[in-house]
Amino acid sequence: MNNNLQGDAIAAAIDVLNEKRVIAYPTEAVFGVGCDPDSETAVMRLLELKQRPVDKGLILIAANYEQLKPYIDDTMLTDVQRETIFSCWPGPVTFVFPAPATTPRWLTGRFDSLAVRVTDHPLVVALCQAYGKPLVSTSANLSGLPPCRTVDEVRAQFGAAFPVVPGETRGRLNPSEIRDALTGELFRQG
């Protein structure tokens, strides 16, 4: 995709996000669906679309660490833990951080923590940079169906009119690894 077409797709996606709606976009392994993390309306639409209970909590993806800082509490991290995290980012490793009381429950669910990732997918980086904040991100698939890996699969599951940022996944076969930022405990193998 040339930069002008990519810019148009990103601008269109931001318009949809500003309407408190859900978009689909390629990530490292599969297409994701996401929305504005600060909009309870948008997050509830995403959860309804995915038939996912709010208490499970969600993942935020960002262009850089600074975008994640308002949503997480990194004050307990040691220098070694920071080094470990930053050696994995940007990339397909998600870390679960303590969440401050100001992080909305529609993001954390029943937890006092939040899963976050700095993506290395250039299209998602550009999208988050243009939007100025992270996105809620979960795999693009309806309950019981496999995650979508192409624009056509997204349209087949969600409908032809569903807003999709066109692009390619990075070809990873597995979803992102998930680890505890403080303990390093592996929650999901990547």
From Swiss-Prot:
UniProt-listed Enzyme Commission number(s): 2.7.7.87
Keyword Cytoplasm set for record: yes
GO molecular function annotations of the record: ATP binding; double-stranded RNA binding; L-threonylcarbamoyladenylate synthase; tRNA binding
Gene Ontology BP, a term: tRNA threonylcarbamoyladenosine modification
PANTHER family: SUA5, THREONYLCARBAMOYL-AMP SYNTHASE
GO cellular component: cytoplasm
Subcellular location: Cytoplasm
Catalysed reaction equations from the record: L-threonine + hydrogencarbonate + ATP = L-threonylcarbamoyladenylate + diphosphate + H2O
Top-level lineage group: Bacteria
InterPro entries: DHBP_synth_RibB-like_a/b_dom (IPR017945), Sua5-like_dom (IPR006070), TC-AMP_synthase (IPR023535), TC-AMP_synthase_SUA5 (IPR050156)
Family: Belongs to the SUA5 family. TsaC subfamily.
Pfam family, one: Sua5_yciO_yrdC
Taxon lineage: Bacteria, Pseudomonadati, Pseudomonadota, Gammaproteobacteria, Enterobacterales
Record-given protein name: Threonylcarbamoyl-AMP synthase
Organism listed in the record: Shigella flexneri
